[in-house]
Amino acid sequence: MDGEGAPFATETYGSQEKWRYRLTEGRVVVREKSEAGGRSSLLGLFKSVFLPQGYPDSVSKDYLQYQFWDTVQAFSSSLSGNLSTQASLRGVGVGNQEATVAAATVTWLLRDGTGMLGRILFAWIKGSKLDCDAKKWRLVADVLNDVAMFMEILAPSFPACFTLIVCIAGVFKETLVNLAGLLVSLVLIPLVTDNPLLTFTLFFFFTVLHLLANYRAVRSVVMETLNETRLSILLHHYLSDDQILSPLEANHREPVFPDFKRRVPIKLGVRLGELVNSPAELQLALKNNRKPYLIGVKDGSVCVCRRQDMPASQEIKAVCQAVCLSTALLPGPAPEGVLKTLCAVGRQGLWEMVSESHKLIENIFPSFLDGLRAHGWQTDRLLLDWDEWRVDWGKKSD
């Protein structure tokens, strides 16, 4: 039996420790650089849940200190807000048998309405200065918000001036659309009081209108950045018609609802161990491949592992190659064009298909990338869903 060989690859997850890969007895074995106890595992779980992806390399040096104090202020503000809300509810008559629902609702709407009006006026007067002095106005906003909550707590002690006080408080706290909605609500509330049928009818109407308006709003957005879906749409159209869609055309074709069609999943930024399990598979992954990423098919998914410093253009190339493989692996009739050849080679084995896909992507990608840039697509800032695993193999891993 062969002894342990020298490390041939290293692997990191975000800014955590490195793992080394060795060849042992014909197998790829991963060895941790240091023992990881339960404490470090819990710490890693905490980081992955509560800190940004790639922390601390993905954020500025002041991030942790700012987030600590921002969390403290948000927590204390939340408690203060709950106290002021309780006082406001008591002031409008919650728990008082003599208070009517309509009167309480109108008082609450007046409170919010004056707040939104104040917000509109403030944005009109000081809007251009907010970006210039963001830190100053952030602090001013918090102070005014605390003053408003104090006034709301104080208001029930002065029943005769309750509405006036909460309206003034609302000016400190709180846009034109919401204000218009409140004005309409002032008309609707007396009509729906003690009328459940009209209440449900109007609720259903406004809910449908809300969802329809949201759908149309999302549909109207045109994004020039590339995500996996838009890149897949662009690549398939290019392979079939030899043309690049404009951002407007591609965004109109992009689905906005979850797609439940059967697809071959694409996993970006996987561990090396998820892609290769033996020296033979490693050699197959490197065949015809001089790129800063490794790609293959494992357990019904197209898997891609990448180096640490991979240019954005190579990220696009990796995803394009993964899309080609994913399409070629779909059951059913073989696609037309260049992907048909890929499907034919796939009958000889998955790694043969991967090797052929390297040749395919080298032929089509330069002109495809030039076309993306010519049609206004951003190729330096991407929205591709890479996991944090980074692998260095070959000479770079020594």
Describe each model-derived feature in a short phrase.
Residues 2-9, 18-20, 198, 202-398:
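Extended, charged interaction scaffolds in large complex subunits
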Residues 11, 19-119, 162:
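Helix-loop boundary and gating motifs at the non-cytosolic
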Residues 52-67, 117-143, 192-193:
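Helix-loop boundary elements of multi-pass alpha-helical membrane proteins
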Residues 82, 86-94, 124-131, 157-161, ...:
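Transmembrane helix-loop junctions in multipass membrane proteins, especially transporters and channels
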Residues 89-107, 127-137, 141, 201-202, ...:
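Interhelical loop segments of eukaryotic multi-pass membrane proteins
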Residues 98, 132-135, 160-163, 179, ...:
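Short, surface-exposed helix-loop/turn micro-motifs enriched in polar/charged residues
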Residues 188-196:
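Short acidic, glycine/proline-enriched loop segments that cap or flank alpha-helices
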